[in-house]
Amino acid sequence: MSSLYSKLSVLKDDENFFLNSRTNKTVKEIQKELNITIDEAMVLSIIISYQIQDTYSTSFDSLKKDFKLQSDEYLKYLNIAYKLEKKGFIALAEERRRGRSSRISPEFNVDDMIFNKLILGYDYLDDVDFSDIYSVVKVIAELIYKKDDKKLTEFRLVSEANRVFDKLDIKEEFT
């Protein structure tokens, strides 16, 4: 997955991205890795591309300008972005949370765990000792803390907890 960095970083400069995105191998790879729809993978991919090249957050309005999107296309992709936000893959930038930008031209940033997994190739579950009950409980507690701290949505908490449980070998005895 770490090779995604170079593949994603150039998407921002592809003026035909939205026309060709459904057949883009990088978009399909992200769709498969995160188990999301092709449209969600497309929007997430372009937000990551902007985030890699420029700043911590991506002004969604810049997509409209850079890709010359018509209003109905822009609203379609914006709706998908809000679905990604609800699922916890992206978050509204802090300025938006304080009410400094509108719902029609928000700024988003990619969740740190998603960014680390896709770009850096780091999955926090690789550091968990699944034979140690305390290690498993600790990672679940950290997820709950992130949810309480509004850094993780309920949807993502459940999906991340399920990832932990899926990696847990029920037959294995804890030490």
Stretches with model-predicted labels:
Residues 1-175:
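Intrinsically disordered, low-complexity N-terminal extensions of AAA+/P-loop NTPases
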